[in-house]
Design a protein with these regions (language model features):
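Flexible active-site lid/hinge loop adjacent to a nucleotide/diphosphate
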Residues: 128-140
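Nucleotide-state-sensitive switch-loop elements of NTP-binding domains
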Residues: 2-125
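Residues at alpha-helix caps and immediate loop-helix transition turns in enzyme cores, especially N-
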Residues: 96-97, 129-130, 156-160
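Short histidine/acidic/glycine/proline-rich micro-motifs that form metal-
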Residues: 123, 150-152
């Protein structure tokens, strides 16, 4: 089973991209998704084309590491799809997701080069507001897709692509919309192995705990709230 992680902040267009991936490649897919939004919202959009395994208890890179790993192994052993697409929550660290998958990878589970979608309209704001979380997704992706750029001027697309290149010089950053990509580009997404040396996180120093809890806490900014989530 090959595992493809498709990340992106909330609203970046992950579900739309996955549906196009399924349509263009016609492979045997299972999608493992989790969001903090209502249960089954994205799943309902996908189920007509592909099996969806929902994990709604929390972020797969934070609070439900064991459940996430167990779900991946269960999917591999029971459904045995050719490909597992992991759609993590938009507020998670891509480096942590890749690390958790890497821990259970073996000869029957291969991790592919991850894809991250970047909303062209929110790029500047997210990079400023979410800082390490947003940069982590960009720096750990093998392919960076600029989404929602259909009506943006080419100069804006090129400018965002240049900024992305500054954060991740080794990534594939096509400036043409993915719907216009040739068939071989889609097939390459399903065969390109993950570059192990890329994965890292800007958030270091938190303890490796199997369980941690809060009775309550106060935050002043959204970024501070997300940092507390990452410590769970």
């Amino acid at each position: 089973m090959k595992v493809l992680v498709i990340s992106g902040f909330l609203g970046a267009g992950k579900t739309r991209f996955i549906k196009e991936l399924v349509r263009r490649t016609r492979r045997n897919f299972v999608v493992l998704e989790n969001e903090y939004a209502d249960i089954g919202v994205d799943g309902g959009r996908l189920k007509e084309d592909v099996s969806v395994w929902e994990l709604t208890e929390g972020c797969i890179c934070c609070s439900v590491k064991s459940d996430f790993a167990a779900s991946v192994l269960t999917i591999s052993n029971t459904l045995a799809p050719e490909f597992l697409v992991v759609e993590p929550t938009g507020v998670g660290l891509l480096s942590a997701v890749l690390e958790n998958i890497g821990r259970i990878a073996y000869e029957r589970i291969e991790v592919l080069s991850p894809v991250a979608l970047v909303d062209i309209h929110c790029f500047d704001e997210y990079l400023k507001t979410f800082d390490a979380f947003y940069a982590d997704q960009i720096r750990n992706a093998g392919t960076l897709l600029i989404s929602k750029a259909e009506n943006s001027p080419p100069e804006r697309v090129a400018a965002v692509a240049a900024e992305l290149r500054g954060l991740n010089a080794g990534a594939d950053i096509p400036q043409r919309h993915y719907s216009e990509q040739p068939q071989e580009w889609w097939e390459a997404l399903l065969s390109k192995p993950r570059a192990e040396e890329r994965a890292f996180t800007d958030l270091e120093g938190h303890p490796e705990l199997s369980q941690v809890g809060y009775s309550g806490f106060t935050v002043n900014t959204m970024n501070e709230f997300l940092l507390k989530l990452q410590l769970l």
